[in-house]
Structures are given as C-alpha cells and as structure tokens.
Amino acid sequence: MKIAILSTKQELSSTQRLKEAALARGHKVKIINTLRCYMSLSQEKPTIHYMGKELARYDAVIPRIGASITFYGTAVVRQFEMMGTFCLNSSMSITRSRDKFRSLQFLSRKGIDLPITGFAHSPDDIEDLIQMVGGTPLIIKLIEGTQGIGVVLAETKKAAESVIQAFLGLKVNILIQEFIGETQGRDIRCFVIGNKVVATMQREARPGDFRSNVHRGGTTKLIKITPQEREISINAAKALGLNVAGVDLLRSKRGPLVLEVNSSPGLEGIENITKKDIAGMIIEFIEKNAKPIKAYSRYQG
C-alpha cells in the first residue's frame, strides 16, 4: 500500500514510529507537510498539490494534525476524503475532538459520564456558573488548549471569578469543570484502535502541580483498567467517530469519568512504558480497513 503521513514536523517521535512500522510491513510511505499541501476544486475532480506538483494518489492517510492548525489541517484531510482516500481519522471526527465543549456534548449525548462542565459567555453569569459545577475548587480550561496549556486550578471563589473574568475579557472561550480531588493529580490514558483498548498507562502530575500531562513533567506507570473503564474508553472514541484515539479517564468516587479524547495521541510515552508496538497495530488496522472506496463518498461536511 501507499501510505501518507500528514505531519508538519517529520522528526517527531510518533511520526517516525509510524513511518518505521509502515516500512517494516512492506508499505511505501511518505511524510507530507500538511501546511505545504494546497488544494483545487473544480467540477471535474478535487486535487491536492504539494511543493509544485500534483500529489500522487495514496491508499491511506494518517493525519497527525496539531491543534494550532486544526482548521487548515482538517481541510486537507477533507480533500483526501473527497478524492476517495481512506483517512485513519476523518476530518469530521478530528474537528469534533478539538473543540473541548463540543466533544463533551457528543459524549454526554451518548450517556458517557463526565466531570460536571459549564460554559458561558457573559461575565454576569459567572457566579451561577461556579455553583452549577459544584463550587470551588474548580478547573478552568481553554476550549482549544493542549498538553495542559491553558488549564487553571481555582481554589477559591474569588480566584475563580478573577480568572474567568480575565479570560472572558480577552474574548477567549473557556469551560469550567468540577475538580475531582480524589484523583490526586492522576489520570489514565487509554489508547484505542478500532473497537479495542490496546494499551493503558497512568499519568501522575509532578509535585505541586495538578496537570498529569507528560509534557508538563508528569510521570507514567503501567496500570490495569477495569472492564467498565475499557468500555467507556471504546464508547468515547466511537461517539466522536475516531478510529484511533487517546482517551483520558479519571477514577472518581462515582466511577470512571472521561476527561478528554485526543485524536492525535502521542506514541512515545505509552510505547515506552507498555513495550507494545502500537505503531504496528495502527498500520495493521489500516491494512484491514483501507479498501478502495468511491470518491466523494466519505465527505460529510
């Protein structure tokens, strides 16, 4: 098969692992800079050009779309879909996952348990919003933040009001979330491929922080998840339409809660801790599912 990996930074570990895994299984693979793709639409056919030439057809595309280029990146993925190319995660599923509140709305509609979450526009509603999520302490998040950036723990009502007012004053979209204190800065990353959780790890925040992201200095260790945690992870990925996802869970007193669903989960940390060839599993999934399809048939707006 001919496989394209969409990535703006080909040196990234996850991108290289996917390339290695594809080559090891006998496929032709090319890393394509998403931002150097440019597109043409006409009555006859959609095309993608790359560095001065029309891009060759590929059997499958692996989108590694960074949060900062979601709009353009998903447009490129959508163009591949219109050309009939199998995309590991669809443009629609990536878009759903990137807007934190929108993704939680999808999960809530499917009956998936979440931390109580609020969203408001007017500063006049701050006091009621704080009460809606159970009061302080509470978490304040940028709707399009990643890797723990733009996540604030407000421990008092006064602090919460000040931070929320500051964000709203800057016309920044934020969501407010209940603080699950019993997790003690720990969460669980479940790596989902298709309808299966293929790897799990626990992440723990560094001392003095509450964010467990490895990019923020958090540590990881192996963990065994429960059947309920496995089921909720698979259902969360399915609710957003993702074939591959990193589902972050919290173990709360009322059971597992889905914190977030990542459409471009990193491979390095979880492969290192579990010693599993997750990149190889992704390529195997593509082999089983990348069948020739009619052009335009995957485009859903």
Swiss-Prot record:
PANTHER family to which the protein is assigned, alphabetical: RIBOSOMAL PROTEIN BS6--L-GLUTAMATE LIGASE, RIBOSOMAL PROTEIN S6 MODIFICATION PROTEIN
Main EC class the enzyme belongs to: ligase
Residue ranges of every copy of the ATP-grasp domain listed in the record: 104-287
Annotated signal peptide: none
Binding site for Mg(2+) 1: D248, E260
GO molecular function: ATP binding; metal ion binding; ribosomal S6-glutamic acid ligase activity
Binding site for Mn(2+) 2: E260, N262
GO biological process: protein modification process; SOS response; translation
Needed co-factor(s): Mg(2+); Mn(2+)
EC number: 6.3.2.-
Lineage top rank: taxon: Bacteria
Name the UniProt record assigns to this protein: Probable alpha-L-glutamate ligase
UniProt lineage: Bacteria, Pseudomonadati, Pseudomonadota, Gammaproteobacteria, Legionellales
Binding site for Mg(2+) 2: E260, N262
Pfam families, per database record: RimK, Rimk_N
InterPro entries documented for this protein: ATP-grasp (IPR011761), ATP-grasp_RimK-type (IPR013651), ATP_grasp_subdomain_1 (IPR013815), RimK (IPR023533), Rimk_N (IPR041107), Rp_bS6_RimK/Lys_biosynth_LsyX (IPR004666)
Positions with a binding annotation for ATP: K141, E178, F179, D187, R211, S212, N213
Binding site for Mn(2+) 1: D248, E260
The entry's keywords: ATP-binding, Ligase, Magnesium, Manganese, Metal-binding, Nucleotide-binding, Protein biosynthesis
Organism, scientific name: Coxiella burnetii (strain RSA 493 / Nine Mile phase I)
Gene Ontology CC entries for this record: cytoplasm
Family: Belongs to the RimK family.
Cofactor binding description: Binds 2 magnesium or manganese ions per subunit.
